């Protein structure tokens, strides 16, 4: 099918002084979709895109695996064997949102945990010079979500990729530098949907720009 997803997401942004807004997200089959934003409700972007608010809830597959068919045991096992084995100096903890939700389909599709960890280590090492850009005062989760974003960017197999992290409070120069870093490892023919109150870098060829 031409349309891979057409999801609506109601962003609860009252905590940062903004009103709720409805975002419509559309992508085509074969696209990699990166989303940069910070959902304030319990649901994640992944859940929105892959089921909870879709009319075909529970039918979307990543790597041939339906994430909603995962059992609690499978999820717990993956967190322990894969995420829990990631060195703590990378700031990665099992509670980080969406790590298991995006990577678990890879695990179930036959991608071993060591391979995932190796890719995470490699990418994190490459982007470490930008590490301080994510350490923003007043955003206690920024650093963790930045590492989560690195994981999002390196997992190339799923058709939908979620790029999730705070960029609202960095300067335009730093934001451009961050974009350039992720652009170098972004899969070809991918789509980036930027969910943020901050302006997008001018050099980005946006297929679609959604602003919260």
Short names for language-model regions:
Residues 67-83:
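ABC ATPase NBD coupling module
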Residues 2, 115-132:
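Conserved ABC ATPase "signature" region
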Residues 58-68:
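Conserved ABC transporter NBD signature motif
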Residues 149-151:
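Hydrophobic anchor residue at the start of the ABC signature
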Residues 89, 96-108:
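Q-loop/switch helix immediately C-terminal to the Walker
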Residues 136-144:
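Conserved ABC ATPase signature
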Residues 50:
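Helix-to-loop junction immediately C-terminal to a conserved catalytic motif
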């Amino acid at each position: 099918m031409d349309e891979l997803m057409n999801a609506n997401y109601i962003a609860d942004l009252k905590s940062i002084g903004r009103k709720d807004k409805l975002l419509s997200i559309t992508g085509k089959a074969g696209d990699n979709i990166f989303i940069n934003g910070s959902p304030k409700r319990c649901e994640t972007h992944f859940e929105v895109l892959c089921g909870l608010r879709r009319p075909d809830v529970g039918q979307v597959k990543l790597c041939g695996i339906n994430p909603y068919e995962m059992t609690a045991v499978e999820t717990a096992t993956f967190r322990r064997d894969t995420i829990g084995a990631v060195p703590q100096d990378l700031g990665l903890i099992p509670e980080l949102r969406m790590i298991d939700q995006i990577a678990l389909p890879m695990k179930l599709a036959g991608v071993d945990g060591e391979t995932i960890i190796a890719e995470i280590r490699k990418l994190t090492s490459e982007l470490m010079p930008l590490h301080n850009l994510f350490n923003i005062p007043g955003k206690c989760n920024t650093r963790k979500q930045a590492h989560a974003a690195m994981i999002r960017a390196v997992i190339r197999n799923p058709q939908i990729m979620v790029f999730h992290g705070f960029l609202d409070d960095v300067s335009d120069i730093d934001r451009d530098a961050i974009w350039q870093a992720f652009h170098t490892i972004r899969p070809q023919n991918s789509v980036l949907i930027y969910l943020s109150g901050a302006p997008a870098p001018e050099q980005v060829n946006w297929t679609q720009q959604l602003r919260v």
